[in-house]
Amino acid sequence: MNQDEHKIVVRRMAGLIAAASVLIAVYVLRLIFLQLVNSDSFKAQATNTTDYNFTVTAARGDIVDSAGRRIAASTTSYNVVLSKLLMGDEDLDAMLQRIVELLEAHGEKWNDSLLIGEPDAAGHYSFTAQADSTSDQKALAAMKDSLGLQQYATADDVMEKLVEDYKLESYPLHWQRVLGGIHYEMQQQAFSNVNNFVMAENVSEVTVATIKENSLTMPGVEIVETSTRSYDEGDIIPHVLGRVGKITAEKWKVTDENGQTTYPLREKGYNMNDMIGVSGLEAVYEDELRGKDGVETITRSSDGVIVGTAMTTVPEPGHTVQLTIDSAFQQAVDKALARNIEMINSTYNSSSSAKAAAGAVVVISTKDGSVLAASNYPSYDQNLFATQYSQYSSDPGLPLLNRALQGLYTPGSTFKPAVAVAALDSGIINRFSTVYCNGVYTYYDDYRPKCTRHGHSGNIDVITAIKWSCNIFFYDVGRRTTSDVYDAYAYKMGLGTRTGVEVNEATGRLTTKNDSNYIASLDVQAAIGQGNTVVTPVQLATYAGTLANRGVRYRTHFVKAILDSNTGETLQETQPEVMDVVEDKGETFDLVREGMKGVAQTIPALAGYPYTIACKTGSPQRSEGLSLIHISEPTRH
């Protein structure tokens, strides 16, 4: 190689080295830019993660008795929930089939409120709604309305509509029914990008584990931890506690008379699938028992793998509602009531008219009107309500009826102390006033009511009249006092009016001159607790408390306090509330109570009791049975 050629080679090599150096420099600078300047952006692109927020249901507050013993509590359970957002482009019906097969393999059930059974051999369907069930027929009508069908539509018509709407023609009849039912349930729960669909509730831990193991192949199928209501003793005041249940479509979407639609529960922060108090104290104290839901954020990669979870908002449990009821005492009263009814039935087994089919007992504290026990017989078990509702609702003994608060009964002679208070307080009679009893009341020519004269006859004063329940005395005193006057006193003492309890109660009624069947003789009938007068057991208990308190009537109540569920701190305490007062003029209540103490001395089981007892029995002429008001004083003999 000559010198000129060597120079050319050197120049070319130098050019190549320079070009390579430039390329290397550009590459290095690009790497620096990617790793240092824009690393976060490219890292996100590489991982391609997405955050999803899920509601974490707060635990519902407990309901406890006066001693703090738990009556109703929340226990953790697991639901299978479908998220439309997470499902993406998955074949929904194919996914539903997989879930159903998985649930069936583990003995689970799924939500399906479609009132249609499986097809018969000919491929026809039938409604499962009971013809004699008002609730079933109402649900059936609502189902047809929601599908845009006429009320005369058959079960086949309903299924044809569902198959057409959700394109289920290619599926066998069995799967058409299964998938059609699930789609209908989705419609009821308003399944959308906003509302998840609760497909199955309270599933087993085995089912939970299986679904989590298959999460990569079942996108959008989530296990959500929630809380369900449970009862340590399901038979303790179930009528008063009430129940929780799912939000119904009617409560979720409200349309007023002007056609305006609102969503009041959504505005209060509820989701459509939430549980809510539907009756009793569970409904009345919903705002206290309901907690504040939390939010859990789940981060998923582009291939569906969960790469992170965080509790964005921690859920707060609801408050504890403490009752005035003592659960041990309540159970003792329940047993005593059942035992006495069984004793009556065994004693009078030859006389159907003397048998006792049902009963109620209410015990209140005279200090402040707090309810210590409220028993119904027959009753039911909260833990069995869902599975045995059909038996409970068809039972002729009406175990679902809250007799203690809503049963209306003729008070009979238990009404007589109210008439005595009215007559004494109004000056119609005094301690020395008497009425002659010869067994027949002869004031009316065409109406001659009688008296048994049990234990008495001749001139009877108010103490003796109450002790021996003399009808003649109260016929005459009632006529002279008039129903206008003694009714006013009875109302003040708690009869024929609301007692103030937190849950639904019947008002009852007293006999008045405004009654369509009123005649003058009704005044004497009503004076012994007959006529048109009907009251509730809780009113009788409130009335007895008013007599014990010398005319002061407190609001009858079941709730003692609202407590912080974490600390036990008292947030709100029920204070004694005076609802009405009968002014005690002189010795009115002393005389009435003296007569009622005399009643106790005529009853062998009470005569030797270690406490002073004042009471009054009543045996109305109607067939409701026996009533009794009973006052125990804390003074030993």
Walk through the language-model features, giving the residues of each.
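Short beta->alpha linker loops
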Residues: 202-203, 327-328, 481
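Bateman/CBS regulatory modules and CBS-like beta-alpha motifs in cytosolic regions of diverse proteins
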Residues: 320-330
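Membrane-proximal periplasmic segments of bacterial cell-envelope enzymes
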Residues: 1-314, 350-360
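A short acidic, often aromatic-flanked loop/helix-cap motif at beta-alpha or helix-coil junctions
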Residues: 229-231, 330, 508-510
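Beta-lactam-recognizing serine transpeptidase/beta-lactamase-like catalytic domain environment
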Residues: 72, 78, 299-316, 325, ...
